[in-house]
């Protein structure tokens, strides 16, 4: 075997092994999951809890942002509760005991806190917050009460 043939075989061998190494990198088995630079990191601290005991209760909780806490607890029947949060560092809590109660909390902004507690029947309460650093709490004990709180800053 002459030198040129041996050099050509060595070059062919090196080129073919380089292709295998590049192909192996395409599998990405050695990378951690979600390490793709094209993905956004998951939102920080979104927590939602809905706990229902009874019949015909309706609850809706929608969150968009970071560091959000939403909690709905219903005991009884025919109750409605809605929480909509958009922003950062928001907390909304709704607790309902009885029948036919309706409650809603809407929060836009940051660092807001809202709480509705209903004990009784056919009560209606709503809290709407838009801005920063707002706090509101509503407690209804009895029947047929209605309240609406709107805070803007």
What are the residue ranges of the model-derived segments?
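Bacterial N-terminal signal peptides that target proteins for export
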Residues: 1-7
């Amino acid at each position: 075997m002459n030198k040129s043939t041996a050099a050509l075989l060595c070059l062919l061998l090196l080129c073919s092994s380089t292709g295998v190494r590049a192909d192996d990198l395409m599998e990405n088995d050695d990378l951690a999951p979600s390490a793709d630079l094209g993905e956004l990191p998951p939102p920080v601290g979104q927590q939602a809890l809905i706990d229902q005991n009874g019949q015909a209760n309706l609850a809706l909780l929608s969150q968009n942002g970071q560091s959000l806490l939403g909690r709905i607890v219903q005991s009884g029947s025919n109750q409605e509760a809605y929480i909509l949060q958009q922003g950062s560092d928001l907390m909304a809590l709704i607790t309902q005991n009885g029948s036919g109660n309706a409650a809603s909390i809407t929060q836009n902004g940051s660092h807001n806190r809202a709480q509705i507690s209903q004990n009784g029947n056919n009560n209606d309460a709503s809290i709407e917050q838009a801005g920063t650093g707002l706090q509101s709490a509503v407690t209804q004990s009895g029947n047929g009460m209605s309240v609406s709180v709107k805070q803007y800053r």
